[in-house]
């Protein structure tokens, strides 16, 4: 009896195959960009509200203080 050798059927590429090196590189790049963007946002808010001179207030500091409910005249309690 002769046995037949199974023929190889060409398979379609697996749609769930990931190039993990590329996924890791893109993920780390996005994480770094978002991290640096967050640091810049935090630092920009601190620099904007910092007083340059104790005798005069800049207009940016007045706008920052108006956002805080506790700095309103008369106590500003809720």
Swiss-Prot record:
The keyword Transmembrane helix applies. One of its GO terms (molecular function) is sodium channel regulator activity. It comes from the Eukaryota. The keyword NADP does not apply. One of its GO terms (cellular component) is plasma membrane. It is found in: Cell membrane. Glycans are attached at residues 3, 7. It holds the Pfam family ATP1G1_PLM_MAT8. Residues 44-78 are cytoplasmic. It is a single-pass type I membrane protein. Residues 52-78 are annotated as: Disordered. Keywords: Cell membrane, Glycoprotein, Ion channel, Ion transport, Membrane, Phosphoprotein, Potassium, Potassium transport, Sodium, Sodium transport, Sodium/potassium transport, Transmembrane, Transmembrane helix, Transport. The modification Phosphoserine is found at residue 71. Its main location: membrane. GO terms for biological process: monoatomic ion transmembrane transport; positive regulation of sodium ion export across plasma membrane; potassium ion transport; sodium ion transport. O-glycosylated; required for stabilization and translocation to the plasma membrane. InterPro entries: FXYD_motif, Ion-transport_regulator_FXYD. The chain crosses the membrane at residues 23-43. Residues 1-22 are extracellular. Belongs to the FXYD family. The transmembrane domain is important for the interaction with NKA and with the functional effect of FXYD7. Associates with and regulates the activity of the sodium/potassium-transporting ATPase (NKA) which catalyzes the hydrolysis of ATP coupled with the exchange of Na(+) and K(+) ions across the plasma membrane. Reduces the apparent affinity for external K(+), an effect that depends on the presence of external Na(+) and voltage. Increases the apparent affinity for intracellular Na(+). Regulatory subunit of the sodium/potassium-transporting ATPase which is composed of a catalytic alpha subunit, a non-catalytic beta subunit and an additional regulatory subunit. The regulatory subunit, a member of the FXYD protein family, modulates the enzymatic activity in a tissue- and isoform-specific way by changing affinities of the Na+/K+-ATPase toward Na(+), K(+) or ATP. This is FXYD domain-containing ion transport regulator 7. It comes from Bos taurus. The gene is FXYD7.
